[in-house]
Amino acid sequence: MDALTSSLVRSPIVPSRTSDNGSGSMFLTASGPGFTRSGSSRLQLRLRQNASARSSRSLQSLTTTAKTRRSFVVRASSASNDASSGSSPKPIAPLQLQSPAGQFLSQILVSHPHLVPAAVEQQLEQLQTDRDSQGQNKDSASVPGTDIVLYRRIAELKENERRRTLEEILYALVVQKFMEANVSLVPSVSPSSDPSGRVDTWPTKVEKLERLHSPEMYEMIHNHLALILGSRMGDLNSVAQISKLRVGQVYAASVMYGYFLKRVDQRFQLEKTMKILPGGSDESKTSVEQAEGTATYQAAVSSHPEVGAFAGGVSAKGFGSEIKPSRLRSYVMSFDAETLQRYATIRSREAVGIIEKHTEALFGKPEIVITPEGTVDSSKDEQIKISFGGMKRLVLEAVTFGSFLWDVESHVDARYHFVLN
């Protein structure tokens, strides 16, 4: 089952395809399809101006409502304090949101984070109105043949704008969940001013991240950490020099693993409450079953290039001692192949886009060169120094990010349907 961790990474940052649900490629570029003709450019500018005006009115409406309330407590971030003192505010997340709705939510996150849910509801209502309006026009309007190309471009442009807005709404909600947990996201990884050259100068917050998950889910997360850190699990102060690209791959894979774990854990906790768990997922596993489970983990290690690269060539046998039996792992191993594949699939293009863009904001866009022999040229691959404690913090954040992403995707889909499966 944990071979899923390795199979999830199919490109330098994220996998290249979703399940066959008609959603197309999972690898999304940072900017949606654009048009080079001047007419379309004017249309795009007009659409963005209209969206910006709507967001400005929304901000005025929400802040006016907040001012009339005497008893609310504003949980202001350090960024708002910096802004009031005239210094440049620090970003609260690596990815800077670009759409008018995204920038609007960024302001709310900094100044009035408790108003984010209301702001999101407002933005989703506007998205639904826009989508309904376009659907009615498509059904009722008789478009002359000479205008059909322009009409399709307008519709495509609006759809791309809605998708980007939806991505940034999801991202803002994930960031808000980290703020509620009082855990700051790791900033963009850049050359360090630390004398040791280490990039991991951020706060650890490991205990807070661990407490955000159910006991059964954390057992799986601990095993995931054991696969990545190997024998260094007990020596977190050691520093390693490792490819920045590899760290980015591990981070992205861990986000997707967290998404998968939360999805499975949600079903597990429900069946546990209803006392309908399958017999194989209780704690009465035989030693043979436990040995088979450990073998599955060892097989996952041998097929996981990122794990092998970071752990310094530790063998699968070396990892075996770190892997512990887990009720949730036994539960997942009881799935048939079709169910396992379905649970391992990220459901929406928007969620995939967030994973890709957030990872690129953290580690930069990888510059990958393929040699004539078909191998990857690593000469331009930047090396960074990071402690194993810093790597543990990154992985825990990534798994938590994926878990939160599952939560907010489900929450938003209940109000604005966009998940295809």
UniProtKB/Swiss-Prot annotation:
| Keywords attached to this entry | Chloroplast, Plastid, Transit peptide
Q: Name one GO biological process term.
A: response to wounding
Q: Where is the composition biased (Polar residues)?
A: 16-28
Is-annotated flag, keyword Plastid? yes
Q: Which GO terms describe its cellular component?
A: chloroplast
Q: Where in the cell is it found?
A: Plastid, Chloroplast
In which residue ranges is the amino acid composition biased (Low complexity)? 74-88
The record's region (Disordered) falls at 1-40, 74-95
Presequence positions on this chain: 1-75
Q: Tell me what induces its expression.
A: Induced transiently by UV-B, ozone and wounding.
The protein in question is named UV-B-induced protein At3g17800, chloroplastic
What species was this sequence derived from? Arabidopsis thaliana (Mouse-ear cress)
